[in-house]
């Protein structure tokens, strides 16, 4: 039994996980499948009741009187707003800007550009660390299915192939790298490791895999025979632009459709990540 501390002069609330946390496995709240209602009781009387939804991508919204609560956004209006891909491309055309430039301009209405860049590079660092862990760990993943990790062996085999034939990439070798990096992240997610929700946990392997691909195979200073690229690539601009563009596309889906696997299924969240 635990007690939730009083906040802002409120009361302490006794809370017993065994009896007070109730899971309704065959029921769903009206707005979204991932929902939770908090109810505080005083005897038989309800003192306060509030409902929250986890709608994917790290967004949490509260259910109020409005039947469809909206995500609370920053108060500063974006200078280049868009809700669809067509509107985004129109902004780029009208102002002769790239997608990353439009995204950065919108971000800098609420924070400095260097802060945005720093946060994006921090995201890359977490993605990279996740890939490295996934490519270096073996064994069986948690759960009753007893699934064995595969990314480490696949990664080791790819590195060996590069060493045997340096400078001579196989026709589909780059696809193999995409596969192993995505698998490494998915295995880390299954093991409870630290990942970046991009756009969701279930589809979190695709964006890091594509970004690693860009750094390894598309960066002007990259070495295609160097295995998995290091975290300090010397090409911060590519990384920042990649994540800004990915964020802009994800924003379109978040506003006009959904990025939540609970709402649109596994293929929906994976489809968003692949876009």
Language model feature labels by segment:
Residues 34-36, 48-50, 194, 203, ...:
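Structural beta-strand/beta-sheet cores of well-ordered domains, especially the beta-sheet scaffolds
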Residues 269-275:
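Active-site pocket-lining segment
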Residues 28-32, 187-190, 235, 273:
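Solvent-exposed alpha-helices and their adjacent loops that cap or buttress functional pockets
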Residues 2-166, 177:
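C-terminal regulatory domains involved in ligand/effector binding and gene-expression control
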Residues 114-266:
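Accessory "access/gating" subregions that flank catalytic or transport cores
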């Amino acid at each position: 039994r635990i007690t939730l501390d009083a906040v802002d002069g409120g009361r302490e609330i006794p809370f017993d996980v065994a009896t007070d946390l109730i899971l309704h496995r065959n029921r769903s709240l009206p707005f979204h499948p991932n929902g939770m209602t908090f109810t505080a009781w005083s005897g038989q009387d309800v003192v306060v009741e509030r409902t929250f939804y986890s709608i994917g991508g790290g967004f949490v919204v509260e259910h109020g009187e409005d039947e469809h609560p909206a995500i609370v956004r920053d108060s500063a209006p974006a200078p280049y707003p868009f809700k669809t891909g067509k509107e985004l491309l129109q902004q780029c055309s009208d102002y002769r800007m790239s997608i990353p430039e439009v995204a950065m301009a919108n971000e800098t209405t609420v924070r400095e550009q260097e802060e945005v860049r720093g946060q994006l590079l921090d995201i890359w660092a977490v993605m990279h660390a996740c890939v490295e862990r996934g490519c270096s760990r073996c064994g069986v993943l948690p759960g009753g299915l007893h699934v064995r990790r595969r990314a480490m062996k696949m990664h080791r085999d790819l590195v060996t192939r590069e060493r045997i034939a340096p400078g001579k990439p196989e026709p589909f070798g780059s696809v193999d790298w995409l596969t192993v990096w995505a698998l490494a992240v998915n295995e880390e997610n299954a093991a409870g490791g630290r990942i970046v929700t991009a756009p969701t946990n279930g589809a979190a392997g695709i964006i890091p895999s594509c970004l690693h691909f860009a750094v390894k195979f598309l960066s002007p200073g990259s070495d295609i025979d160097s295995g998995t690229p290091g975290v300090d690539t010397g090409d911060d601009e590519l990384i920042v632009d990649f994540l800004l563009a990915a964020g802009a596309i994800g924003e379109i889906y978040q506003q006009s459709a959904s990025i939540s696997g609970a709402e649109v299924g596994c293929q929906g969240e994976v489809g968003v990540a692949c876009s």
